[in-house]
Amino acid sequence: MKKEFYTCKNDRAFKEVFLNPNNSDLLKALLEFILKIKIDKLEIKKTELLSGNVNIKDKRVDALVYTGNKKIDIEINSQYEKYLNPRNTAYICNTYQSYTLVGKEYNQQTDIVQVNLTWGLGAEEDIMTKYMIMSENGKLFVKNFIIYEINMDYYNKLWYSKNEDEIKKNLYMIMLDLDKKELENMPKDDIVDKYITNVTIVNDNPEFQKYMSEEEDKKKIQNSLLSEAKETGYTSGINDGISKEKVSIAKNMLNKNISIEDISDITGLSVEAIENIK
């Protein structure tokens, strides 16, 4: 059977490639391109174990990087879902809170930054959107809370446009979601060459392939359960007994280890209400 080639649109592949200490130059080049800054030194904070044990996964941020006066959380969103923005906001708020509580005083000298690499926004949407906390008149509440959402569909479209000049300008973004054959055919520099070598090594790792196969099987099972839950919710009455029915559905889904965000999206129950059910 032909094995799947996982691009860095997949968060596990991204972590295995970019959070490898030997590949800090790859992460540096990527962040410099996105943020348009010069990075002299960066420190990668491991948010979960990497190549030593690809079978261990928790619900922490995808990547956390310290550089200069910035703490950068990187999130890989392989598809756009309604729960993503609240979840990712919770992540950056947690980072902001942690930094603020540790410091000796409240100040805004360190930027708390989140970079979202998001697929599914639509190629015609803005290439990058910057979000900050401000009033409706544009007055900043704090200056060091910053979220960037990168529209990865734009870079996919750029690759298929065959515009060589634009492709060369955006290599580090485009390469993230190219398959093995496409990577062979793209323009290259030292960073691209090293990326291709490392993403290939990751995909050739039997443990990585085993982990990914198991993850895909879990997703298929979860999708089936989600469909069943939606159908049950649709046909179950939706009148006087709606609350009990929703709670029952939520309990069953919790027992199947379906994420609280998905349960909330399907049942309409708040995250807080679902947590109280537990």
Regions picked out by a protein language model, each given a short descriptive name:
Residues 1-208:
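Conserved single-residue anchors adjacent to enzymatic active/cofactor-binding motifs
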Residues 2-4, 68-77, 174-278:
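Short, charged alpha-helical interaction segments and adjacent helix-coil junctions
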